[in-house]
Amino acid sequence: MKDYLRNSIRALLLVLAVLLSLPAFSKAVEIEGINYELEATSHKAKVVAKRHGQYAREIAIPETIEHNAVTYRVTAIGNGAFSGCTELVSVVIPNTVTNIEGWAFYYCTSLSSVAIPNSVKCIEEETFRGCSALRTIDIPDSVTTIGRGAFMNCEGLLSVVIPNCVTTISHNAFYGCTALSSVALGCAAKEIGTQAFAHCPRLKDVFCHAASAPKANSQTFDKNASRSTSLHVPGASVENYKATMPWSTFASITSLPAEDSEHQDM
């Protein structure tokens, strides 16, 4: 009985310690048309969804905001913050933002312009899923991981350049990007998940700058698409790709243009 009480007290103390260590966010406040959660101790702010209605047209997120005579630094865009905002056209994100949480721009079907700052390290799960008006996306060099379904069903996306620091492209990352014709993978690419580029029927060229063929599987690309898609890799790595599935199934495997290889090695 004593052991039971002792263990129960320890468990309660542990829970209390965890709760006390969590950021103390206040209720959402609205400042100049944008809703935020404010963290009292660190003076950080997170953009969150509107309580009523949707964000529309152009949104410019500031680096800092003022509330009750206190300055807060905007460091995050919260889970689902702009989800389903079908009239949102463009978003400017400041360099103070280090975290864009999952589903942040989920099915923002009119979103055609968004600049991801160099402070962001990961594009989270389904962040831009269903943003069908996006034609291009500039992924900054700071990003190392592209999460599951991050750009899934971005049906207007024409091309994508994955920067050199990205090591992992997760499952379904670009699934259903039906207009996608060109993909450039950086030299740090290590692993590409299942169906990452599936249902991309217009994919014609894949430029992969990794010296060794990244880990992938038979479902990473469409089987039919790979038969009509050209793969371009470093000259010294052509045989490595030809001997590695699923890369060996591509219609042709050729050396990257010299100037393209030099650019990626910089």
Segment roles from a protein language model:
Residues 24-30:
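Boundary at the C-terminal end of the N-terminal hydrophobic targeting segment
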Residues 260-266:
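C-terminal cell-surface addressing/anchoring modules of secreted/extracellular proteins
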Residues 194-195, 216-223, 242:
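Short, T/G/N/S-enriched strand-turn elements that build extracellular solenoid repeat scaffolds
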